[in-house]
Design a protein with these regions (language model features):
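Ser/Thr-rich, Pro/Gly/Ala-heavy low-complexity intrinsically disordered linkers and tails
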Residues: 1-5, 15-64
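A domain-level signal for the mature, folded cores of soluble proteins
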Residues: 51-157, 170-260
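Residue-level signal for well-ordered, solvent-exposed loop/turn and beta-edge residues enriched
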Residues: 166-167
Length: 260
């Protein structure tokens, strides 16, 4: 199936206007009908979320009454190219992937996500901030993975980073049988959620998948690209197609930020 590229140029975190797409194709080309869940995130027939997250003083509530800058997370969806069987969360874009994660812990994945679809792709910006190569983990990517008998229910994604949005450095992601998946995103549960006291920028507690810019030889990055690397394709019958196939993006968080 030919994918539709949806551009979200200029859709910033603070924007209160309805979602607008600037593309020769419209969002209507993507099947965003009633969501059909096949157990995604640990739920069946999962309801879509509105993507709204509590904000305070131009940022987001942090643990212990602190305020986290809005640009410690994605501030803009630069582009979104849904793959086949995408659609879940599309009506809540872009807000559903901006700001902090809404983790569900070991047993249940977040429903505050957008499904990329089979081989779908999304590009995010953290501008005006930037991810910098500092001590240890620099970037966290949050999917809605959960554990079944201690084994990750993984929907994998390949993560790339860029400082200019043109030249990319990619963390190698080679899907395999598991139960661990190397530098792929999408296999660690997420524990941080608004109001639960777990900092979304603490890699020791937040959950999600960790990335170090040093591993790809980059000193700074302002853009993050995620591509679905799942191995489950869509059903052939149009009437049986779910809208939850592929990597389900909850959020990204900047651990080592140019402006903390």
């Amino acid at each position: 199936m030919k994918s539709t590229s949806i551009l979200f140029s200029g859709l910033l975190l603070a924007a209160a206007s309805p979602l607008a797409c600037s593309s020769s194709d419209s969002a209507g080309d993507v099947d965003a009908g009633p969501p059909i869940s096949l157990g995604d995130g640990g739920f069946v027939d999962a309801p879509e979320q509105d993507g709204n997250k509590p904000q305070v003083d131009g940022g987001f509530p942090g643990p212990d009454g602190s305020v986290l800058r809005a640009d410690r997370f994605a501030t803009k969806v630069v582009s979104f190219t849904p793959g086949d069987c995408a659609g879940f969360g599309l009506t809540a874009m872009p807000g559903v992937v901006l700001g902090p994660p809404v983790g569900g812990g070991d047993s249940n994945g977040s429903l505050d996500v957008v499904s990329l679809g089979f081989e779908g792709e999304i590009v995010l910006s953290v501008e005006p901030n930037a991810i910098v190569d500092g001590p240890g983990v620099d970037l966290l990517v949050f999917e809605n993975a959960f554990l079944t008998s201690g084994i990750p229910n993984a929907e994998l994604g390949e993560v790339s980073v860029s400082d200019d949005g043109t030249t990319w450095k990619t963390f190698p992601c080679t899907p395999g049988p598991g139960p661990t998946y190397g530098s792929c995103a999408g296999w660690h549960p997420v524990y941080s959620a608004p109001g639960n006291g777990i900092s979304p920028v603490d890699p020791a507690k937040a959950g999600g998948d960790s990335f170090d810019l040093k591993d790809v030889g980059l000193a700074r990055a302002r853009f993050v690209r995620i591509r679905d690397r799942g191995t489950v394709a869509c059903p052939a019958s149009p009437g049986m197609k779910p809208t939850t196939v592929g990597f389900d993006l909850d959020a990204i968080a900047v651990v080592n930020a140019q402006t903390p």
